[in-house]
């Protein structure tokens, strides 16, 4: 079966190239890094000069001037990006490289949490983080510490995968959640032990894998350990023939609080002047179809209410502004004005990495992707004690949604009319105590679930 997949991956190469080209044309690929899709990367190893300057590592190189000089001269400056890239050290010095694959934005935040906590225990370890989407790449490039580097995952073909693995030679691979690339996983397991963490299977994928159970088992046998995020997912894995998976809960419960620039927060808070801020976060066009028609009504009822919209894909900003105009709403993007135009109906945040800043000033946050896409990360807003609202489709975050609802830490709505009713109720001064309770419960929920991270680390560190 795997040989058949390998053969198909060659037959389908022209289609892969066309897909990459289309993604490039619509702005979903970075032309400056397109070579990484073919395992041609400027970063050949993740160690940097600080690794060589480390006292412990100076000791390792002591008395071996030739290798020390080679290590130093292998570090070069990439003038186009300003990043430091490096040729591989000898295998004996490249033994502490962890490769983490995070498909998209949510998984990337979990990767950052793992890196932060593993590096505290093992300061000599370095990290390679791969992802597939441009949005996750931008976040990771901005947030990764010096001990880590990001690269796009190459096309799932044996030629590119083997070249990628030869370049990096990781010593442990960690795949987060549900993106299973057969060739990458099969070849990766030949290089090092692989772990699948925070694993989940959507209902749709589960039905598809049931028809290809033997192939699913063939892919999953490459993992030395599989940790799922819920009892429901554990049951699905068991039904698919994976009997040794364990459930430790959702690592997204342990995501670290999003960073906030305190100077910018001070300016923003002062500018908003105690207005009640409602944030619509990680929105898709399907969400905006529901949200935009109710905003005029909401603002007419609550003059001190201000709306901030943060699209999942900021490159859609022009179409969102046009859509606002069609609903007779005025809107300004952050790229046009660094602070909200208070006379406008909506402020659109079209920059990455600023979600924490706007959650900091929000009273209520609606989590996008929850009408048709299965929902996005609820917990990021919970860390900022926001009253959280989400739509009817949380199929990708079922257990988190169930948990917050059971703890009265969030509200689920059915449609636009229901959303307007809930927002009107919560923003009414008569219901301020109930609003306060939802906000407090959201923060308590994430604080009480921090133990999940410790349990994950106990398992992961056994493979270091």
Curated annotation (Swiss-Prot):
Compartment(s) where it occurs, according to its Swiss-Prot or TrEMBL record: Cell inner membrane
Transmembrane helix recorded as keyword: yes
One Gene Ontology molecular-function label: Kdo transferase activity
GO biological process: lipid A biosynthetic process; lipopolysaccharide core region biosynthetic process
Residues that, per the record, bind CMP: 311-312, 352-354, 377-380
Family: Belongs to the glycosyltransferase group 1 family.
Protein name: 3-deoxy-D-manno-octulosonic acid transferase
Species per Swiss-Prot/TrEMBL record: Rickettsia felis (strain ATCC VR-1525 / URRWXCal2)
